[in-house]
Curated annotation (Swiss-Prot):
Predominant location: cytoplasm
Taxonomic source organism: Xenopus laevis (African clawed frog)
SUPFAM superfamilies to which the protein is assigned, alphabetical: LDH C-terminal domain-like, NAD(P)-binding Rossmann-fold domains
Active site feature: H194
Protein name: L-lactate dehydrogenase B chain
InterPro entries: L-lactate/malate_DH (IPR001557), L-lactate_DH (IPR011304), L-lactate_DH_AS (IPR018177), Lactate/malate_DH_C (IPR022383), Lactate/malate_DH_N (IPR001236), Lactate_DH/Glyco_Ohase_4_C (IPR015955), NAD(P)-bd_dom_sf (IPR036291)
Top EC group: oxidoreductase
UniProt gene name: ldhb
GO annotation, cellular component aspect: mitochondrion
Classification via Gene3D superfamilies: Lactate dehydrogenase/glycoside hydrolase, family 4, C-terminal (3.90.110.10), NAD(P)-binding Rossmann-like Domain (3.40.50.720)
Amino acid sequence: MSTVQEKLITNVCQDKAAKPTNKITIVGVGQVGMACAVSVLLKELADELALVDILEDKLKGEVMDLQHGSLFLKTPTIVADKDYSVTANSRIVVVTGGVPQQEGESRLNLVQRNVNVFKFIIPQVVKYSPDCIIIVVSNPVDILTYVTWKLSGLPQHRIIGSGTNLDSARFRHLISEKLGVHPSSCHGFILGEHGDTSVAVWSGVNVAGVSLQSLKPEIGTDQDSCNWKEVHKKVVDSAYEVIKLKGYTNWAIGFSVAEIVESITKNLGRVHPVSTMVKGMYGIETEVFLSLPCVLNGNGLTSVINQKLKDDEVGQLQKSAETLWGIQKDLKDL
């Protein structure tokens, strides 16, 4: 007896489902992972979205919730599983998984615990998607991007840390608030570590090509009567402030990651401040990953823009590298 489906549909092609060409996987379905997932869905960047996590009930609930909204989305397939086979043939894998920092825990201890988590995650990702591009979001992101590069065996251009893409967005937002100009018209970069030693490149801050330093040479320094230096301090402190108020950060990093994904999936060649290997640049001679302005397209991170930095900015970048190397050099089991 024929089923309703058989009576309704006459098949013309035996292979009804085409293989996805822009499959995106999110590893970790916590607040950040789900913000990344929703941002990717709303920007219509994937023809298949896969979620993976060790928390089975949480994972099942999140994927059901997204699937129930399928009518309002243009991503035909949303899947989830604890088993990494669900991630097979991903074009991009976004890693948000890891362990949270405990009260009083040293940064090195936190990193080492996350190394142990990544030793499980990364080989599984590469096993099922050997040609993928990996975007690392878990913190401390620069060190864990280095860890991912070491564990994956993938070339540098396919390992990207979300880095200071969000820090730079915060920077531009705060500049826009001071000037009354939209953030998209306020240009400036935060480089280096995604964290306390990040570098505000005041020499490059401009609106419509007009350098703010040309108008006020002391901008961003202690001698600045307008206290623009406070803008960078707010960038550094902003995550702590949001966490204090709501317990975590998720939406802005989700939007930031989706923009990085978009530059890759749409082969845009846009410049993003993201974390990459910087050995040999700006006098840095250690294997650290830091954020520099990078070109992202369909092949991944294809080039770095050689930004003209002032001597004090180069010094700050080198200090950022030293801070990360101080932790990185003591990591075990890589």
